[in-house]
Amino acid sequence: MTTRYIFVTGGVVSSLGKGIAAASLAAILEARGLNVTIMKLDPYINVDPGTMSPTQHGEVFVTEDGAETDLDLGHYERFIRTKMNRRNNFTTGRIYEEVLRKERRGDYLGATIQVIPHITNAIKEKVIAGGEGHDVAIVEIGGTVGDIESLPFLESIRQLGVELGRDRTLFMHLTLVPFLGAAGEVKTKPTQHSVKELRSIGIAPDVLICRGDRAIPANERAKISLFCNVEERAVISLKDVDSIYKIPALLRSQGLDDLVVKRFGLECREADLSEWENVIYQEANPNGEVVIGMVGKYIELPDAYKSVNEALKHAGLKNRVSVTIKYIDSQTVEAKGDEVLQGLDGILVPGGFGERGVEGKIQAAKFARENNLPYFGICLGMQVALIEFARNVAGMADAHSTEFNKETPFPVVGLITEWVDEEGNVEQRHEASDLGGTMRLGAQLCHLLEGSKAAQAYKGNSCVERHRHRYEVNNKYRERLEQAGLVFSGLSSDRKLVEMIELKDHPWFVAGQFHPEFTSTPRDGHPLFEGFVAAASAHQKRDLKK
């Protein structure tokens, strides 16, 4: 199979939405019957985002094969059916690490290691490898043209443009076309300068995606075409919309996919966007609203919980309700108590690391349990629910996790020292292990308890979900917790690790050690999120009757 490559760059400012634009184009091409994948090349020096602060970088998206990747890969999986893996995201840090490892082994036979050709060759090899087996590979270059960090990546794709030729490569550049209220018009000069910067390093864009808060007038598109040396039909206006799931149709209406298909000489059907039309219709026509309180520690940057946010919206689509997320700092719960938890239809406690705010999360779990309020715990959200139950129901007053209190008399949650991975291999860790890449990561099989809410949600006796954690339920306390009424509704493939817990006599109190948000999509949703939002809607209706 001959793979075609579309390289996506950004100019003027960051956060223009390159990832969404790339994913939307991929969705249209997939709707035409093409096999599409997307890669993200990140210019930062970290080997991966695994140890980066969520408040700086946003969430870490975990792939099926256990790679800790950029949150844009979450967008990719939500827009197309192709599953991402570790080949779909790499950083400057990883490239340099691999090149230096080869140099230490003597693979370069004593050569002087340089950015060109050694670093650029390594980048090109990864791009080609990531695209193998697909009709089209869309490659997003992180950062903004003009940043010094991005230069090795830009040089690499310039070389690929020459080596593969025009019939296998296309360069798409996103720019900002701002509207100046004082002048009453949009300004094209930033786009002209951005294209000039890109051309100065040898890349001539074939397509311009012009971002702005409004559609670009026809005369301004003609002006951009003239000054940037791009066909007028390849100047695409991408205005702000109230839903990112409208963007595939917006790009399709301007013929972007036709331009790509013609350029590459691909034979394929017309795009069928009926699934996306259904998503947009459901989003625009809810029959009600539920308010979900998300109790976390990274709430100052909602992107820290990007996949959770999207999964809740997807569940709303399936339940025909709009979901309003109320972000609640867990430290505020510690300071103000239950008053900040009033007026909610459900509580969700997402994953996280570190002691800050953990008691507020425990308090939120207690509030949900005692008030029959739907509760959904994810990763740490499961652990705090178990700690709360151990303290207040099972008679272990000072129960805790050894992550937060190594001296606790009841370490109901502790460091996992050994587990079996998805291929049956035994993984081992200890306290001194590096933080990066040492967690239980990736897709794992979970056996579900017959008759449990978990089994009902999944409509079966097993599921496969992605993990990212170091701590687990301490098996020493399983029997005591079960006797007190806690249900262990999900166990690992070897049945040695607790994957899910729930409460019997509660409308919906379910928690999982894994991250189900990573597999939720707008077209398919996710059974646990759907069950949670359905329970929240039912709780609201019961309250209204009262």
UniProtKB/Swiss-Prot annotation:
<dbReference type="Pfam" id="PF06418">
    <property type="entry name" value="CTP_synth_N"/>
</dbReference>
<feature type="binding site">
    <location>
        <position position="72"/>
    </location>
    <ligand>
        <name>Mg(2+)</name>
    </ligand>
</feature>
<dbReference type="GO" id="GO:0005829">
    <property type="term" value="C:cytosol"/>
</dbReference>
<dbReference type="InterPro" id="IPR029062">
    <property type="entry name" value="Class_I_gatase-like"/>
</dbReference>
<feature type="binding site">
    <location>
        <begin position="187"/>
        <end position="192"/>
    </location>
    <ligand>
        <name>UTP</name>
    </ligand>
</feature>
<dbReference type="Pfam" id="PF00117">
    <property type="entry name" value="GATase"/>
</dbReference>
<feature type="active site" description="Nucleophile; for glutamine hydrolysis">
    <location>
        <position position="379"/>
    </location>
</feature>
<feature type="binding site">
    <location>
        <position position="352"/>
    </location>
    <ligand>
        <name>L-glutamine</name>
    </ligand>
</feature>
<feature type="domain" description="Glutamine amidotransferase type-1">
    <location>
        <begin position="291"/>
        <end position="542"/>
    </location>
</feature>
<dbReference type="GO" id="GO:0004359">
    <property type="term" value="F:glutaminase activity"/>
</dbReference>
<dbReference type="InterPro" id="IPR027417">
    <property type="entry name" value="P-loop_NTPase"/>
</dbReference>
<dbReference type="GO" id="GO:0044210">
    <property type="term" value="P:'de novo' CTP biosynthetic process"/>
</dbReference>
<protein>
    <recommendedName>
        <fullName>CTP synthase</fullName>
        <ecNumber>6.3.4.2</ecNumber>
    </recommendedName>
</protein>
<comment type="pathway">
    <text>Pyrimidine metabolism; CTP biosynthesis via de novo pathway; CTP from UDP: step 2/2.</text>
</comment>
<feature type="binding site">
    <location>
        <begin position="147"/>
        <end position="149"/>
    </location>
    <ligand>
        <name>CTP</name>
    </ligand>
</feature>
<comment type="similarity">
    <text>Belongs to the CTP synthase family.</text>
</comment>
<dbReference type="InterPro" id="IPR004468">
    <property type="entry name" value="CTP_synthase"/>
</dbReference>
<feature type="binding site">
    <location>
        <position position="470"/>
    </location>
    <ligand>
        <name>L-glutamine</name>
    </ligand>
</feature>
<keyword id="KW-0547">Nucleotide-binding</keyword>
<comment type="subunit">
    <text>Homotetramer.</text>
</comment>
<dbReference type="GO" id="GO:0019856">
    <property type="term" value="P:pyrimidine nucleobase biosynthetic process"/>
</dbReference>
<dbReference type="GO" id="GO:0005524">
    <property type="term" value="F:ATP binding"/>
</dbReference>
<feature type="binding site">
    <location>
        <begin position="380"/>
        <end position="383"/>
    </location>
    <ligand>
        <name>L-glutamine</name>
    </ligand>
</feature>
<feature type="binding site">
    <location>
        <position position="14"/>
    </location>
    <ligand>
        <name>CTP</name>
    </ligand>
</feature>
<feature type="binding site">
    <location>
        <position position="223"/>
    </location>
    <ligand>
        <name>UTP</name>
    </ligand>
</feature>
<keyword id="KW-0460">Magnesium</keyword>
<keyword id="KW-0479">Metal-binding</keyword>
<comment type="function">
    <text>Catalyzes the ATP-dependent amination of UTP to CTP with either L-glutamine or ammonia as the source of nitrogen. Regulates intracellular CTP levels through interactions with the four ribonucleotide triphosphates.</text>
</comment>
<keyword id="KW-0665">Pyrimidine biosynthesis</keyword>
<feature type="binding site">
    <location>
        <position position="403"/>
    </location>
    <ligand>
        <name>L-glutamine</name>
    </ligand>
</feature>
<dbReference type="InterPro" id="IPR017456">
    <property type="entry name" value="CTP_synthase_N"/>
</dbReference>
<dbReference type="GO" id="GO:0003883">
    <property type="term" value="F:CTP synthase activity"/>
</dbReference>
<feature type="binding site">
    <location>
        <begin position="239"/>
        <end position="241"/>
    </location>
    <ligand>
        <name>ATP</name>
    </ligand>
</feature>
<dbReference type="InterPro" id="IPR017926">
    <property type="entry name" value="GATASE"/>
</dbReference>
<dbReference type="InterPro" id="IPR033828">
    <property type="entry name" value="GATase1_CTP_Synthase"/>
</dbReference>
<feature type="binding site">
    <location>
        <begin position="15"/>
        <end position="20"/>
    </location>
    <ligand>
        <name>ATP</name>
    </ligand>
</feature>
<feature type="region of interest" description="Amidoligase domain">
    <location>
        <begin position="1"/>
        <end position="266"/>
    </location>
</feature>
<keyword id="KW-0315">Glutamine amidotransferase</keyword>
<dbReference type="GO" id="GO:0046872">
    <property type="term" value="F:metal ion binding"/>
</dbReference>
<feature type="binding site">
    <location>
        <begin position="187"/>
        <end position="192"/>
    </location>
    <ligand>
        <name>CTP</name>
    </ligand>
</feature>
<feature type="binding site">
    <location>
        <position position="140"/>
    </location>
    <ligand>
        <name>Mg(2+)</name>
    </ligand>
</feature>
<feature type="binding site">
    <location>
        <position position="14"/>
    </location>
    <ligand>
        <name>UTP</name>
    </ligand>
</feature>
